[in-house]
């Protein structure tokens, strides 16, 4: 192969030109417009705006890459990097390479790009650096699915995003994540063409950003004691400090890293509410005489508000000056949500200020408070972003409203000519559960399945075309109250963040069967890159009933692929029978089940040795909660070392119902129970939580049949379960009737902290 004399690089141009002439003639004859069926077969996520399929394939196993300037080389290096990480071939740079990255000024929009694949080569074109980068990632997706022959189909892709703001929010205040994880998340966002990283850095539970002028914000505000057993050293009994913060050097590193991946970092400094960490660091900024001395370990809406004094605005100005210096992007998020006004109402000086300002009430005062910050940022060339509560006051025309109370805030903002981002609860809140499996991590218990998530419509019909232009985009928010580890964060984020990308980039017409196939391909790419995601919704779930003969009813929460099973102990394969209806099985059989998308295995294989005991055991997750006031999956506070269980409970009413429990022949109950600290700030609602008085100091588990007001058939003392952190087994005799009956499980106890939870129940 000839070499370029100037560079010494191999020159593929003569060969490529000859092949290209042949290819262009063939393509002109057989090029076809893509159909819906063709699009469904492409392993791309998000789906490009336009695709045209041509005849033939391109072999890239020995191809080289041509790139001429900084932007094209960065895109080429991204392709090389992703291929290397996913087990693909090593493609070197060469003048005249058959994979060519180049500028095309006719492609409008910095993020737009075109990818053309012919049997002779690949052409990736864009006018902007981001477009070149995204073109490289789309090409990698095609290559990652190519298989051992390393061939991709001839086609042409013209692509651009539907929305400018395609975001993910990470809450680093409730639980601190290391810099390496933050960068990994940003890298994964870039792979999905997500371009806005909203970094929630301050809250009641911690302050996470170094501010030179106020060192106590991190020396005091970054650290707390965890609730319950987790807050103490098991060897010494002394309190354990928990938390952390990001130094300025680390933040600059993260911001620079994000810039190389075309991701804008939007920091959030949440005020005037969610301010306990600030008040602990500087009590003079509080609205009460004796503010907390440390950040809180409680979850919920705390009443602590900053005092709207001149000292507070001096503090905020100094903080924002340092924040602006660290984050060069156009946006600064100032929170503004969930500001309970009780402390302002009770403070005479604050009431006097309301009158002096000529304001109506405390809500108007918050509007004035937020407007001062917005004006401060505007004078420094930044746009304020705030949660939709900021609409209650004077909102600058260039402010961005982040709509979390459903989509109403975005609609109001757009109709008033202001920009908005859709981040509605619950659908875009990534701390909601993805299935009701007992294997799910902690989080809010209202289930937002993948299909429900995908069906969200980011273009409200009530808006005109002109008003819709004010919808900058959408964002998924990961609040981390119940997500203490980065492994759990990955499971809550992925693959749902990829669905956010699909909605924000493609804004597609809904076609779940097609999308689920592409989602399976995206999951496969995560596995190739060795990146974590939540496989639990892909796993089969089973309910067993019967005694002499067992009926197994199967389902898969994700509704992706096909469940296939074996009953001879072998591992399921793509050729195993598909599950179509409940299975009738004999005790002694081993049922093995796994999902497949075509030949691709999904999730994990579940195995159940069939016995009557399966029908006599239920986890709490398989039961119904008696109430739905604050349903959560809560991570146990113990053991202090090792894996902790996650409990399914309504903290306002700890009570579980097992429908149709098979009581015939049962004489004893074995229950797995645990204790959790009550660390929830729920205001006066705490008075609504009541328990029956206990007969013994530790309390009892009470089991009733045929409803929670039905006959008491078991009372099991809990004293033995208090001797360990984590969970413990307790047991007791029951007085069962024959047949199937609903069982209701509740606890007796003296107070609400700690409170008992049920993990599973077995009838013997």
Regions found by a protein language model. Name each.
Residues 513-638, 677-685:
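Short, compositionally stereotyped local motifs that mark structural "simplifiers"
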Residues 40-165, 488, 504-529:
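Contiguous, structured surface segment used for ligand recognition
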Residues 107-317, 322-331, 372, 376, ...:
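Feature activates predominantly on carbohydrate-active enzymes
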Residues 607-764:
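Extracytoplasmic
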Residues 384-399, 405-550:
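Flexible, acidic glycine-rich loops studded with aromatic residues
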Residues 20-36:
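Gram-negative bacterial Sec-dependent N-terminal signal peptides
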